UniProtKB/Swiss-Prot annotation:
Pfam families, alphabetized: C1-set (PF07654), V-set (PF07686)
Complexes and interactors: Immunoglobulins are composed of two identical heavy chains and two identical light chains; disulfide-linked.
GO cellular component: extracellular region; immunoglobulin complex; plasma membrane
Gene Ontology biological process terms from the UniProt entry: adaptive immune response
Signal peptide: none
Keywords: Adaptive immunity, Cell membrane, Disulfide bond, Immunity, Immunoglobulin, Immunoglobulin domain, Membrane, Repeat, Secreted
Purpose of the protein: Immunoglobulins, also known as antibodies, are membrane-bound or secreted glycoproteins produced by B lymphocytes. In the recognition phase of humoral immunity, the membrane-bound immunoglobulins serve as receptors which, upon binding of a specific antigen, trigger the clonal expansion and differentiation of B lymphocytes into immunoglobulins-secreting plasma cells. Secreted immunoglobulins mediate the effector phase of humoral immunity, which results in the elimination of bound antigens.
Location(s) in or outside the cell: Secreted; Cell membrane
Alphabetical list of InterPro entries matching this protein: Ig-like_dom, Ig-like_dom_sf, Ig-like_fold, Ig/MHC_CS, Ig_C1-set, Ig_sub, Ig_V-set, IgV_Light_Chain
First-listed, main subcellular location of the protein, grouped into a coarse class: secreted
Region (Constant (C) domain): 109-214
Region (Variable (V) domain, involved in antigen recognition): 1-108
The protein's name in its UniProt record: Immunoglobulin kappa light chain
Amino acid sequence: DIQMTQSPSTLSASVGDRVTITCRASQSINTWLAWYQQKPGKAPKLLMYKASSLESGVPSRFIGSGSGTEFTLTISSLQPDDFATYYCQQYNSDSKMFGQGTKVEVKGTVAAPSVFIFPPSDEQLKSGTASVVCLLNNFYPREAKVQWKVDNALQSGNSQESVTEQDSKDSTYSLSSTLTLSKADYEKHKVYACEVTHQGLSSPVTKSFNRGEC
């Protein structure tokens, strides 16, 4: 199969900026390349085909170029409607592989997260499961690291993260990390803590609670 590699994976920009996304094919695909734009909850929209041909109705600020193995999509002057995820797709072979996507996000100012920790509810514990939630609110940029510690022992493999779409008003993100344990495991330990590292924090922030005291 022909593999498609896009870069960068995220691009932070402001309205009016000129931005360029690169797509590389693992072998020559001539000009059999399409570009798509996708917004959350919507189907992908075709922007460009045959590497540089604009789909009908697509604004001329979108410019495609390249052939063989290297291609670019340039937006000459970024508009508010252009903040979305962009994908390249080769259609030289039957596999019609897509690139992994490039998210064009609003360039914000660095903002540290507000961090909260929530123990499992009594209702949930009755069902035999315990979920501890660490919530990070209103931060930028999107990269944030959450580490769970139970009685000071680092946890791995038993938590899941979910990040919101970028807030249209203040350009920030929010994130929830959920540590899931059995009720029996939960009741074997006392101190539950989440440690958060982010560019906006001069040092990691830890929020914790003692089981049975909250």
